[in-house]
Design a protein with these regions (language model features):
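Extended, low-hydrophobicity, polar/charged segments
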Residues: 1-204
Length: 204
């Protein structure tokens, strides 16, 4: 902050009752890293069976475009020596954050990953696919529909769709470690803290 003035009077948003162990870890990660103004909402069990308009109402999102998800992608053609994700510019895995209303574009993602690698990875050695459930669980520690960058078991390099940064108001929603827990925050604050790459990675 500027000049060390105290935090706002509100402090962090409360952890919803019944948020679960993983949800508590995500909450603690956000608080520890100083992500201000986030909100957590416990969704009803039928959340994923219902349309986006229903989900928007549950969390209080400004529009269906503000509902986003984190997907772990794997380069299935990565060379033998490329196994992990220690180097964010040269990684076998990326966690990509996109809107539910947008479709991830594999070719755009491939081009972006190719650019990050700076010549170390020829395009024919890139084929980005959704990871299997088993790999997802091992890398993230989260179940399907609960994946999130916060408190993730492995530090997977992050890519966020540039469209999320253009949302107005600047407050988007993500999974939060448990299937029925959602978290919302400003893209600007999220980027400051978690420092994802910003990419044009969805269909126009």
């Amino acid at each position: 902050g500027g000049g060390g003035e105290p935090d706002g009077p509100e402090g962090p948003a409360p952890l919803p009752e019944g948020a679960g162990e993983k949800g508590a870890e995500v909450w603690a990660d956000l608080v520890e890293r100083g992500v201000e103004g986030f909100r957590m909402v416990l969704a009803p069990p039928e959340y994923y069976q219902r349309p986006l308009e229903f989900r928007m109402g549950v969390v209080g999102a400004a529009s269906v475009d503000h509902l986003c998800k984190s997907i772990v992608m794997e380069n299935t053609r990565a060379p033998e020596e490329l196994q992990g994700c220690e180097d964010p510019t040269y990684s076998k895995y990326y966690m990509v954050i996109v809107q539910y209303t947008a479709k991830l574009n594999a070719e755009k993602l491939k081009s972006f990953v190719h650019g990050l690698a700076g010549g170390r990875l020829p395009k024919k050695k890139i084929n980005m696919r959704l990871v299997s459930e088993e790999v997802n669980d091992r890398l993230t520690g989260f179940a399907h529909n609960a994946v999130t960058p916060m408190a993730c078991a492995t530090q997977i390099p992050l890519i966020i769709s540039h469209k999320i940064l253009a949302l107005s108001p600047d407050f988007f929603w993500l999974g939060s470690g448990e299937v029925d827990l959602k978290v919302g925050f400003s893209a600007e604050k999220f980027i400051q803290v978690y420092q994802p790459y910003v990419a044009d990675c969805t269909n126009d």
